[in-house]
Curated annotation (Swiss-Prot):
The keyword Acetylation applies. It comes from Felis catus (Cat). Keywords: Acetylation, Calcium, Metal-binding, Muscle protein, Phosphoprotein, Repeat. This is Parvalbumin alpha. Pfam families: EF-hand_7 (PF13499).
């Protein structure tokens, strides 16, 4: 399964292009632009599993740095600052990784 099976390819491209500048990433706007917030819990869970590259059941900080590439392969990596800000927003229990429930909360806040 790929991201374009769940979200519109054109929406993804526009969202990625909106955040090409370093330190411009805003997860709330990005999730809105790709239409993630409007998706069913099942589809949001599928997106989580696509982003969980090592299939550990968590999105760790190193995977988070590549989150845009999970949506669009030619996208840039997040900066260290952007990655840390996204982790701080998503990691509610402070274990240094985002589980599926924390990801749901992150999407719901967008």
């Amino acid at each position: 399964m790929s991201m374009t099976d769940l979200l519109g390819a054109e929406d993804i491209k526009k969202a990625v292009e909106a955040f090409t500048a370093v330190d411009s990433f805003d997860y709330k706007k990005f999730f809105q632009m790709v239409g993630l917030k409007k998706k069913s819990p099942d589809d949001i869970k599928k997106v989580f599993h696509i982003l969980d590259k090592d299939k550990s059941g968590f999105i760790e900080e190193d995977e988070l740095g590549f989150i845009l590439k999970g949506f669009y392969p030619d996208a840039r990596d997040l900066s260290v600052k952007e990655t840390k800000m996204l982790m701080a927003a998503g990691d509610k229990d402070g274990d240094g990784k985002i589980d599926v429930d924390e990801f749901f909360s992150l999407v719901a806040k967008s």
